[in-house]
UniProtKB/Swiss-Prot annotation:
Associates with the 50S ribosomal subunit. This is GTPase Der. The keyword Nucleotide-binding applies. Coiled coil: none annotated. GTPase that plays an essential role in the late steps of ribosome biogenesis. One of its GO terms (biological process) is ribosome biogenesis. GTP 1 binds at residues 9-16, 56-60, 118-121. Belongs to the TRAFAC class TrmE-Era-EngA-EngB-Septin-like GTPase superfamily. EngA (Der) GTPase family. It holds the Pfam family KH_dom-like.
Amino acid sequence: MIPVIALVGRPNVGKSTLFNRLTRTRDALVADFPGLTRDRKYGRAELDGEEFIIIDTGGIDGAEEGVETHMASQSLQAIQEADIVLFLVDARAGLMPADQGIAKHLRGVEKKTYLVANKTDGIDIDTALADFYSLGLGEIFPIAASHGRGVSQLIEQALLPIVGKFVEEEKELTEEEENAAYWAALEAEQKEQEEEEEEDDFDPTTLPVKLAIVGRPNVGKSTLTNRMLGEERVVVYDMPGTTRDSIYIPMERDGKEYILIDTAGVRKRGKVKETVEKFSVIKTLQAIEDCNVALLVIDAREGISDQDLSLLGYILNSGRSLVIAVNKWDGMTQEDREQVKDMLDLKLGFVDFARVHFISALHGSGVGNLFESIQEAYTCATRRVGTSMLTRIMKMAEDDHQPPLIRGRRVKMKYAHAGGYNPPVVVIHGNQVSDLPDSYKRYLMNYFRRTLQVMGTPIRIQFKEGENPYADKKNKLTASQIRKRKRLMAHLKKSK
């Protein structure tokens, strides 16, 4: 599972600046949940091929009466859920009582913690850091987050070694890691091959489909989970997954195996109403990372919120297949239903490839139809398409709509091949293809989707240009060119 790093510290010590600095390595703030956690932001970053989730917690204060009393519950939860904690202090302001209170709390938590002294630009670092060694947290990493100084050393010396160990340890886990190992092997296989392979050692359709049921609190995720399990009347048992938070529940339907990833935990149907469904952003993000298909549950009576759109954006950025379930559809008037459909068309137009189902998890109406779309999305995401087929589709798209001129020259697209699966990746080779405008790239993506009939999964297109073999070579004259040049020079001398 993807490791989690929490940034903690007093207010205004530069946590958000470091958060932006780290997430900009991926050039995106992947998940921000406004209104849900006012003092926390979530980002997904990639450094040297290692991915991790970063939490920017709110400032912790109130050391006068003890940090346990005044530390925000969200920040406490972030520390508990994190694998690595970066404790930021202000080197300019010096050691403060709140810093000592936070350090005391962190020493009592069994988490790998690094002390990071920010705002060290323009000051004597050794003098400024002397007092902070009394916190008893070991080595101090001086940085200037606003300018990026020291951040690379922090990444190389602190984060990458721990993240690497975390990933290796997870590979030694059992049960669920067998499926994860398959997908890792499949991705490595896809990077090495640029031509279609006739022989496939792995058939994705024989593996269980990992299905993550995600959504805001109280939209009916657990009710839907229990309904999907109860319909099949199978023996359900809890299978602890690779994380502390998610429960993996195997089930079977129509001869096909599934693994439901329940972020809220499994509860008996009779107790669902008695328990307040808790929402953990970290659980949800990790479930999305680990699944093949994400089932996003939306409350029809509350409409689409910013949290729904944030989750949707994270699913798309992660390249996961998507099915949307609009729950609590029962009991609504026809007029209200039409309004909900109009709102969905307006706000979800950018994910028109995803199937939308109107269901009632409580009564079971429409739930059975979800599996057809889940299977369709998974099949489209893992389907093999040959180079000849992709190249033919590319030529058809080019014939229907010629690419624009770039610096007075026509872009030449030579051939296309599969660059990966889950999500499907199409790699197009040619001249100046990377300079194509975004509008034409969207046209190509939609053309491939329409022709291949890809539903339920995003499709990505990558462009590669061939290098000019003569770019670094001097022009060498042929023998005839040399003789011609000599005659020309002799003629010029005579004319003078």
